[in-house]
Swiss-Prot record:
The chain crosses the membrane at residues 12-32, 66-86, 96-116. Belongs to the complex I subunit 3 family. Its main location: membrane. This is NADH-quinone oxidoreductase subunit A. NDH-1 shuttles electrons from NADH, via FMN and iron-sulfur (Fe-S) centers, to quinones in the respiratory chain. The immediate electron acceptor for the enzyme in this species is believed to be ubiquinone. Couples the redox reaction to proton translocation (for every two electrons transferred, four hydrogen ions are translocated across the cytoplasmic membrane), and thus conserves the redox energy in a proton gradient. The gene is nuoA. GO terms for molecular function: NADH dehydrogenase (ubiquinone) activity; NADH:ubiquinone reductase (non-electrogenic) activity; quinone binding.
Length: 128
């Protein structure tokens, strides 16, 4: 039993060491064989746009509402993941698991109602 565990640790250690060696080797080769940039040329830093000189600022300033919507999406997507996992073991969970799922969904739905009430999901500004 101990020999099997020891062999597994050695295999894992060899894997980690070889991964580190491979990373160091790739980084070293790219440093040695890569292009040296001695003179800063402005035209090399511009993105290629089919031969047309770029116009305007390439940085987009997005509203914070986009980030909020993305965070809400991730939260409710995780809710769907948990409900899917719960639905696959619903027979083993029994009534207690059913009540726990109802509590879970009700907490999340109350959070959604709260977000709607404070206006976090509104896209238009408030005109008072």
């Amino acid at each position: 039993m101990t020999a099997e565990i020891s062999a597994q640790y050695w295999a894992f250690a060899i894997f980690i060491i070889s991964a580190i060696i491979l990373c160091v080797l790739i980084l070293t080769l790219s440093f040695l064989l890569g292009e040296r940039k001695h003179i800063k040329v402005y035209s090399r830093d511009l993105p290629f746009e089919s031969g047309i000189n770029p116009v305007g600022n390439p940085k987009l300033h997005l509203s914070a509402k986009f980030y909020l919507i993305a965070i809400f999406f991730v939260l409710f997507d995780i809710e769907a993941f948990y409900l899917y996992a719960w639905s696959s073991v619903i027979r083993e969970a029994g009534w207690l698991g059913f009540y726990e799922a109802i509590i879970f969904v009700s907490v999340l739905l109350s959070g959604l109602v709260y977000l709607v009430r404070i206006g976090a999901l509104k896209w238009t500004p408030n005109h008072s």
